[in-house]
């Protein structure tokens, strides 16, 4: 529909990833894009230091596999990286409507205003502009007794037991 029926004459896209990334997952994505879109992707593995240089400094890439761990329990820990003026905006994404929604959310504590604004920003980022393609989120493996109550997981694989108790 976009000028490349069945992916014909679509340029091969290069997808950069480090040796530490989950190679089988990216190979599965490569296969899905080929089967469903007719698009060829070349996977290029790099050592971490050159990858970071290409990704953050040179910004010489079309697609790259990266990850981010939220520092706090709020959507802005992820969405805030993509405002046009953020030093973390490695994609160089710029969208005034997105920036405006994030700004609106940052100016209030009223969740009835914040959350709809953040949902609109997320829609712009992922659905409308397709700047990022979230593939998965990490869920650490945990063995926990059903009797242990009120344990809270916080970012960076830490657990808060301050209010925990054992049910009899």
Place the predicted regions along the sequence by residue.
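Ligand/substrate-recognition segments at binding pockets and active sites
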Residues: 1-70, 111, 137-140
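Short, solvent-exposed loop/beta-turn-alpha elements that line the ligand-binding surface or hinge
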Residues: 4-10, 54-59, 80-107, 137-168
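Short, structured coil/loop segments at alpha-helix boundaries
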Residues: 19-23, 95-96, 110-114, 145
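Extracytoplasmic/secreted proteins, especially bacterial periplasmic and envelope-associated proteins
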Residues: 24-28, 32, 50, 74-77, ...
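N-terminal cationic-hydrophobic initiation segments that often serve targeting/anchoring roles
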Residues: 34, 56, 106, 125-126
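N-proximal short alpha-helices
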Residues: 71-74, 78, 87
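Short, charge-rich amphipathic alpha-helical segments embedded
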Residues: 128-131
């Amino acid at each position: 529909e976009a000028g490349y029926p069945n992916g014909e004459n679509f340029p091969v896209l290069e997808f950069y990833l480090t040796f530490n990334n989950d190679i089988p997952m990216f190979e599965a994505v490569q296969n899905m894009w080929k089967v469903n879109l007719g698009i060829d992707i070349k996977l290029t593995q790099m050592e971490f230091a050159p990858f970071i240089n290409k990704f953050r400094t040179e910004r010489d890439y079309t697609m790259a596999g990266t990850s981010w761990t939220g520092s706090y329990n709020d959507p802005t820990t992820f969405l805030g990286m993509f405002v046009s003026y953020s030093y973390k905006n490695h994609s160089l994404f710029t969208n005034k409507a997105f920036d405006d929604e994030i700004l609106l959310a940052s100016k209030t504590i009223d969740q009835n205003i914040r959350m709809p604004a953040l949902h609109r920003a997320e829609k712009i980022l992922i659905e409308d502009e397709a700047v990022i393609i979230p593939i998965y989120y990490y869920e650490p493996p945990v063995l926990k007794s059903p009797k242990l109550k009120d344990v809270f997981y916080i970012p960076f694989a830490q657990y808060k037991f301050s209010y925990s108790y054992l049910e009899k």
